[in-house]
Amino acid sequence: PARYASTRFPAKPLAMLGGKTVIQRVYEQVTGVLDDAYVATDDERIEAAVKAFGGKVVMTSVDHKSGTDRCYEACTKIGGDFDVIVNIQGDEPFIQPSQLNAVKACFEDSTTQIATLVKPFTADEPFAVLENVNSPKVVVNKNWNALYFSRSIIPYQRNADREDWLKGHTYYKHIGLYAYRTEVLREITALPQSSLELAESLEQLRWLENGYKIKVGISEVETIGIDTPQDLKHAEEFLKNRS
């Protein structure tokens, strides 16, 4: 999914990053790893840009409240007999094949309904990174199913100094990559928004609140999502250093 009217960074899929648009970089990262790839958008400018670099694109409604809803509409328009639909945010230009394979591997368990990824925070990261509300945290159970996602720091360590929290517990940062069994995608998009979802502005809480299980895979790869113009600057620096 890639929409034009982002509140924090309008037109970000069309922002230039190292001579290519952000959406082209995302598309090039995922083709070859999945059986098929489409950009689902609500804007003719994005549609034209995708066609210009030879990508596949599907026009969807401007009224969707989430990327998951947009994915489902695109899925119904594309048709085909897909077992699993992978939802890759259109602002993740450095998504890696290893991450896509990790989320695909979650479906080797026949009971998996929905899957996503996390990355462990490291003990040497500054506490401000853990506090960042734009980087949701995840807690999981023994079977690596998500218990909860929050913009707050979870868990709260009652008997430890805050500066020692990352040393005393492994915290997990959510990576905004989802995959769903096709029939589950149909079901969850029919659900009304939930109270937890509205409180945290995290759509995955709707699924948990309605009893769906979210299998969690681990990635050690750092991702750089483009949410703000400042993020784009960081991405440009990352790209220069990598090359």
Residue ranges and their predicted role:
Residues 38, 44-102:
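Short phosphate-binding loop-to-helix
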